[in-house]
Structure formats: structure tokens, C-alpha cells
């Protein structure tokens, strides 16, 4: 089954937790999960959370891009909120008991791991949709993703102006 997958987390979350304690980290992670749920509306589903990371699924790249754009605006508008980073991929996966499995999910996670605070990285199918919708896209070339056989072409998707986000949470 085809779907669009996205992993989003907070840049500097480990440093924040180390400096301000586990309770502060848990509070921020819960706040971010609630912010994410609100931003999704009907454009996607919050599949899971782990620490500060959220795993999202949507029917199409277009719907995922809308949801991520809303999440970005919310994070950027929140004073002293850490910078958000994301990776998005569209492809085939298996849905069982409300959970997604497969290489496409793994690719989205690996792409997210390469993103720095304030940036959205995506693979070619998502970037193509972003371009058709007038969203600025910058090619980054082909990269090798850990434990993924094929090199993937990555793109930076310009969703928001990351200047409003706090990058160093300590």
C-alpha cells in the first residue's frame, strides 16, 4: 500500500533533557506531540511517538506537506521552542493493526536523521509534488542511507523561515 511517511523531532532535545532534566524533556515532548496532532487535522495520522520524535503517515505527499507546513508554522510561532527537523518519503509499505512496516518507513526515518534543525529533507517523489505546488525545493544530490541498498536523491523542502526557532535549547 502506498503512503507518505514522515519523522519529525526536535533539534537539541537530548541536550535540553540533559541540562534541564527528564521532567522538562517529557513535558516538551508531550507538548510537541499535542502540537503535531493539532497540525495534522485530516491530512495525516500520528502513528507513534518515541521521546521527542513523532512518526506520521498520510495518503499523499501533498497532504503530508500541508500538515508539516502547519506544524512548522506552529513551532516557529511558539517562543523559545526548539527547531524542528523532518524527513519525508513516499512509497510502499505494509499496514498491520494500525502500524506501518517496510523499507519506505525506514527510508523516511533515515532521511529525518540527516536533517538539521529547521530543515525538511525529502526524497524525489515528495520533492516533485512540492515543486508542482509552488513550494521551493533545493536538490542535495544522492546519498547513501544506512542499511538502504539504493542511494537516494535528497531534496531540501523550504517550508518555513527557521530563524524564529531556538536551536540551542540549553
Regions found by a protein language model. Give the residues of each.
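Catalytic NTP-binding/metal-coordinating core of nucleotidyl cyclase/transferase enzymes
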Residues: 1-66
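Juxtamembrane helix-loop transition sites at the ends of transmembrane segments
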Residues: 30-33, 42, 113, 140, ...
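Catalytic beta-strand-to-alpha-helix segment of the class III nucleotidyl cyclase homology domain
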Residues: 55-164
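Short, charged, solvent-exposed linker or helix-capping segments at domain edges/interfaces
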Residues: 164-170
Amino acid at each position: 500500500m502506498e503512503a507518505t511517511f514522515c519523522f519529525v523531532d526536535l533539534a537539541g532535545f537530548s541536550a535540553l533533557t540533559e541540562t534541564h532534566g527528564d521532567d522538562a524533556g517529557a513535558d516538551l515532548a508531550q507538548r510537541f506531540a499535542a502540537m503535531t496532532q493539532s497540525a495534522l487535522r485530516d491530512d495525516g495520522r500520528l502513528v507513534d511517538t518515541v521521546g521527542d520524535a513523532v512518526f506520521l503517515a498520510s495518503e499523499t505527499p501533498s497532504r503530508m506537506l500541508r500538515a508539516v507546513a502547519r506544524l512548522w508554522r506552529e513551532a516557529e510561532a511558539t517562543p523559545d521552542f526548539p527547531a524542528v527537523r523532518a524527513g519525508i518519503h513516499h512509497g510502499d509499505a505494509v499496514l498491520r493493526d494500525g502500524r506501518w512496516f517496510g523499507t519506505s518507513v525506514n527510508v523516511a526515518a533515515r532521511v529525518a536523521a540527516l536533517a538539521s534543525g529547521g530543515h525538511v529533507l525529502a526524497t524525489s517523489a515528495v520533492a516533485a509534488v512540492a515543486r508542482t505546488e509552488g513550494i521551493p525545493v533545493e536538490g542535495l544530490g544522492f546519498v547513501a542511507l544506512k542499511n538502504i541498498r539504493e542511494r537516494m536523491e535528497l531534496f531540501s523542502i523550504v517550508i518555513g523561515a527557521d530563524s524564529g526557532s531556538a536551536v540551542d535549547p540549553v
